[in-house]
Amino acid sequence: DDADLDAYFKYLENPKSLKSISPSGKFYQELGLDKELVNSFVNIEPGADQGGSSIGKAELFLSLFFNDVGNSEGGIDPETGEIKKAKGDNNWEGVGNLEVKGTNGRLGQQGGRGLDATDTFENLAKDLLSDEQLKEFGDRFFKKPWTMSTSIAELYKLAMQNKVPETKIQSKINKALDVVYFNQNLANDYFKTETDFTDLEEITKNLLKLNAASYSKAKGIDAILFVDTAGGENRYVIVNKSDYDKTIDNKKFWTTTKGPTGFQWTNVNPNLVVAKD
């Protein structure tokens, strides 16, 4: 209504920068504006840009409310006619390409549409287990989409029992994970010690760190903003790529499944949500 528009235009007289607000919180509180006004802008979905990239919720809001954020548009090369995809969703001044993820956003393709990594997992097990172990392991883990954390921990234990050198076990698992996560060769940065491969909570944290870092490296992304576009409170968390590990350790964003079960070999890029206060 007119009052909301007046409040918005008044805000534009002295807009905030994205860098100036808390790295996590609620947008309407940080901006000092009515919650419904902010929600109405967060929920705008303009469609696709010239390059065919979908402009999702909160992307336009960021460029309209923060003076250091602009739209990151795809386009057509005037010389070649080639369609160029935008890197990230917004340009964040002084930071780089900002990716925006709404409720249930993924750092990769949706399950069933992207990579099904079950073949990679089965080949990994064949490399590390005896025939007898493989049959029992396959009966448990190949016939339904078992979680990555549980299956990695069990595979590690059985491979050790099979007298496979620990360095080889770790190397084989990490190579398989690098295939799954955009071939960026970052798994060794996260999976280093026995605990990294056997503790279900640590495995899940490491998978999320690897997913975020590899996705960002592959896509040229410098920061990610997660925003709850479904709860009506516009809760958010902003994460520079240098802070992914710390933010994930603190579970500021996490899989929709609270336990260490969100990653599956048939769904290696699970839905993610902003943590509640």
What are these regions (language model features)?
Residues 1-85, 100-277:
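Short, positively charged
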